[in-house]
């Protein structure tokens, strides 16, 4: 709607000199209409040398050339944008960015020569990122759905999760989820967990959407040992989240939602292995209180713009994570390697259990057949692989399935099963035996394999081992 309103204003401004000229010549001066129209059109081309008979014609004579010049500039700019877009489209990795706000400029700057500034019209590109207000993104996608049918589209949405998309090339994303994934990747808890014998306490001050994503992602990637106990303590809301995600209670790592204020539990806040202060109202004041009340030397702060203008940003005890800026990093938003790993897992399963040939074409075909839940399950498995690689590096072992000791492979397979169970628990699945003899019932959300690794059949254990082998083979 806004696009058509802007276009209408431009047309009205362009026609303003014509209207003034017609009023001055045809109405006030009484000249024939066709003659008046001809002379008015000439004004746009600087072809009016007579003395204006009245003020209307005088205004038209001066504004018509300005209108012509402005449209020439606009046409040149549009032509330049289209030509640049086509030139960048010749690159196999071109990405068009549409939307509003600082995220557009941030993405285009990081994309460099492969970035295409979308503007109002649909320009050719190999992939598309839609940022800004969700309603406008959805409207733009619906308007161009036919042209985008075979293009990967990343659409920013606050209310819709990736599970809401039935189209394999349409991915809903939120900045908070991207930031959470990147934070746990960069923070790397494995070494800390080893030093603490895998007994950790993580405290979150503040919650909201960012806290939800940090917790969900952390429970799926911070898996280092079968007998670990990583506690997550939440201060600052979470009642709705706790009530909806009933499956969290089935996860071995405790999640505690505190109703009392954080400053009544200074012992826990001071001694926690990791303290995350999420962006919230009056965050600088909270940080001042925190630094005064505790002797902590390390605090991870998810900072927005308000903190950047305070001296607190320079405090060595605060590890600033500019989450809004990092959330739009192309590598984390597009992440080709993550998707390649997820598709490789799915294709291997299709080959082993469906006799599907492992070809590049079948990789895409089989991926497109997946329901959103299974698709995201494979992505979760691929995402955890980064932790697995860090563990192997710390143990001094090669990231090779052929060179992996059997005992290590078994450990990694058990950890993978724990992650798989957690993914299902976080979506409120429970153990159960479907009546038709199958392993799972998606409607009732029950699965026969939601049991400890030791209780699995050898065939089911082999699936977890094969998952490790597949991912270690993907570069």
Where does each model-flagged region fall?
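Cytosolic regulatory regions of ion transport systems
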Residues: 1-35, 42, 46-414
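Membrane-interacting alpha-helical segments
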Residues: 337-345, 425-427, 431-434
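Short loop/beta submotifs within extracellular cysteine-rich repeat domains
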Residues: 374, 388-389, 420-428, 458-462
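Short, solvent-exposed interaction modules
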Residues: 406, 411, 415-430
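Surface-exposed intrinsically disordered loops and tails
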Residues: 431-448
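Amphipathic alpha-helical binding modules
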Residues: 443-474
């Amino acid at each position: 709607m806004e696009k058509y309103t802007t276009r209408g204003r431009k047309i009205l401004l362009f026609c303003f000199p014509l209207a003034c000229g017609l009023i001055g010549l045809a109405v006030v001066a009484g000249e024939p209409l066709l003659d008046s129209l001809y002379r008015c059109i000439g004004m746009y081309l600087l072809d009016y040398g007579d003395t204006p008979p009245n003020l209307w014609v005088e205004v038209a004579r001066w504004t018509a050339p300005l209108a012509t010049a402005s449209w020439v500039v606009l046409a040149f700019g549009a032509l330049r944008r289209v030509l640049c877009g086509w030139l960048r489209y010749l690159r196999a990795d071109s990405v068009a960015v549409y939307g509003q706000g600082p995220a557009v400029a941030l993405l285009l700057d990081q994309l460099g020569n492969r970035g295409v500034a979308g503007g109002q019209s649909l320009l050719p590109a190999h992939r598309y990122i839609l940022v800004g207000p969700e309603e406008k993104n959805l409207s733009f996608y619906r308007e161009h759905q036919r042209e985008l049918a075979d293009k990967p589209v990343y659409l920013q949405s606050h209310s819709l999760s990736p599970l809401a998309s039935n189209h394999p090339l349409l991915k809903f994303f939120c900045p908070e989820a991207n930031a959470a994934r990147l934070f746990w990747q960069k923070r790397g808890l494995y070494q800390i967990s080893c030093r603490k014998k895998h007994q950790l306490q993580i405290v979150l001050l503040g919650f909201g959407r960012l806290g939800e994503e940090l917790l969900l992602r952390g429970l799926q990637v911070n898996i280092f040992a079968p007998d670990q106990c990583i506690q997550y303590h939440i201060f600052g809301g979470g009642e709705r989240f706790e009530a909806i995600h009933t499956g969290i209670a089935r996860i071995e790592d405790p999640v505690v939602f505190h109703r009392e204020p954080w400053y009544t539990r200074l012992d826990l806040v001071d001694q926690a292995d990791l303290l995350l202060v999420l962006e919230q109202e009056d965050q600088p004041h909270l940080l001042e209180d925190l630094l005064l009340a505790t002797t902590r030397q390390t605090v991870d702060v998810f900072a927005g713009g308000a903190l950047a203008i305070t001296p607190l940003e320079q405090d060595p005890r605060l590890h600033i994570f500019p989450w809004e800026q990092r959330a739009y990093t192309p590598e984390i938003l597009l992440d080709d390697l993550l998707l390649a790993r997820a598709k490789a897992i799915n294709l291997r399963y299709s080959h082993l259990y469906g006799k599907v040939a492992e070809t590049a074409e079948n990789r895409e075909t089989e991926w497109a057949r997946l329901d959103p839940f299974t698709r995201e399950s494979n992505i979760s498995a691929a995402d955890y692989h980064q932790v697995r690689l860090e563990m192997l590096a710390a143990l001094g072992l090669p990231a090779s399935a052929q060179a992996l000791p059997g005992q290590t492979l078994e450990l990694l397979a058990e950890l993978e099963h724990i992650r798989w169970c957690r993914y299902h628990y976080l979506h409120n699945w429970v153990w159960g035996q479907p009546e038709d003899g199958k392993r799972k019932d998606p409607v009732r959300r029950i699965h026969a394999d939601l049991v400890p690794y030791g209780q699995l059949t050898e065939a089911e254990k082999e699936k977890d081992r094969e998952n490790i082998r597949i991912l270690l083979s993907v570069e």
